[in-house]
Amino acid sequence: MKFHIGKDGEVKIILVYKNAEKVEEANDLYSYLKEKELFKGDLGEVYSHISHSEDKFILLGIGEKEKTTANSLRKAFFNAGKELMKFKVTSIKISIPMFKNLKYESIVQSITEGLLQSEYSFEKYLTKKKISPSIKNVYLDILEEKKEETINTINESKNLIEGIFLARNLVNEPAIYMTPTVLANNAKNQLESLGVEVKIYGKEKIKELGMEAFLAVSKGSFEESQLIVMNYKGNSNSDKKLALVGKGLTYDSGGYSIKPTSSMINMHSDMAGSASVIGAMKAIAMSKLEVNVVAIVAACENMISGGAYKPGDIISSMSGKTIEILNTDAEGRLTLADALWYAVDVVKADKIIDIATLTGACVTALGSINTGAITNNSYLMDNVKKASECAGEPVWEFPNNDEYKELIKGTFGDLKNSSGREAGAITAGMFLQEFVGNTPWVHLDVAGTAYLSSKNGYLQKGATGVPVKTLYYLAKGFKNK
């Protein structure tokens, strides 16, 4: 899909508010449809006037006027893209509208992203493919003085989509093919050509670093664990670094605290945190952001074998802190503990964001709408929230009262890796906080938002790419301060 500035295009998209009095460009048809209750202008509603007409257009509902947001525009244009594919439309034209509550840049970005998101599908293993993308050219009728801004916004949106689609593809890949080594090679292949330095460390180096918690989780698998370190240097005049740490469980059986079959089926998605940081790094590098970002992924599988770690074990970590294993299915926090300490002790990051499909408790609390968050720094949290709002990927902050720390204190080790059912999403985050020292840090629990069991707006079933956009906008605003 290519975007152009101009008024060409085979089919025009006409925007309609819910229950609008009239539609200038198609009022007779709209009045008829409204009277017959065939089209009301609900958000994402589409009426096609394409098949038997020289004046080809679609009516696209954008909902109630006062409720128009960047995200609602994404949803509407996603639906428009899907509808146009059914008719194999190859080119479209859109007059960029103005909304009092939205910046022009945000409007263009939302329209662009909505259309691009409509092209995504994961059909690699289907012998019969579904409807293929057909829109080759999109013509945008814009204000002349906004031309440069529009072109820049389109390019940035396309870079973001590249990162999002990469993340989605990595997560949707079944675990039989997406092993830790394959994940590492994907990071290398996708990022090195963009100027990102990618280093991959195997078991011996991981052991040398003292990452015993990470290694403990991987002991039950035949697949070798991989530490993936991606370094993007966008500002040579600064030594400030933002670290993105992604959970990289390419498959999680639960270990000896084994999951039921129904809970295992989608556990190839337990590396969504790692996929999001790889995707974000791609978008950051493609856009040449003037910022220094280091992404870290501790990739492994959590499996069962004679050598696997067990409930009741006490293990050490790169930080030196010891951990009692009460539940082998609380493994992500163990791999992250060492990856976070690597960000602190080796990378010496100035700010850290970790992203993980960490707890079912977060899904219970927030469902698939909001990403859960916990922090040790309110200023950084505010920046994450602003980035998430810009991205249309809402974040909800959990409390971090010191009293919760009592729930993760160990009896025979410094910490325990599970606090039971009580405040599970919070205590998991508090556990991670033990491995960041005084470095400003935010934990994002994407257990409910990174992978969907059913369609939600412009996000289809399966991997969503959340929170690639949030990480990108956070990095964009970081500016090495």
From Swiss-Prot:
It is found in: Cytoplasm. Belongs to the peptidase M17 family. Transmembrane segments: none annotated. The keyword Manganese applies. Keywords: Aminopeptidase, Cytoplasm, Hydrolase, Manganese, Metal-binding, Protease. GO terms for molecular function: manganese ion binding; metalloaminopeptidase activity. The keyword Metal-binding applies. InterPro entries: Leucine_aapep/pepB, Macro_dom-like, Peptidase_M17_C, Peptidase_M17_leu_NH2_pept, Peptidase_M17_N. Its EC number is 3.4.11.1, 3.4.11.10. Presumably involved in the processing and regular turnover of intracellular proteins. Catalyzes the removal of unsubstituted N-terminal amino acids from various peptides. Mn(2+) 1 binds at D252, D329, E331. GO terms for biological process: proteolysis. Binds 2 manganese ions per subunit. It catalyses: Release of an N-terminal amino acid, Xaa-|-Yaa-, in which Xaa is preferably Leu, but may be other amino acids including Pro although not Arg or Lys, and Yaa may be Pro. Amino acid amides and methyl esters are also readily hydrolyzed, but rates on arylamides are exceedingly low; Release of an N-terminal amino acid, preferentially leucine, but not glutamic or aspartic acids. It is an enzyme of class 3 (hydrolase). CDD domains: Peptidase_M17 (cd00433). This is Probable cytosol aminopeptidase. GO terms for cellular component: cytoplasm. Its main location: cytoplasm. Its cofactor is Mn(2+). Mn(2+) 2 binds at K247, D252, D270, E331. The active site is at K259, R333.
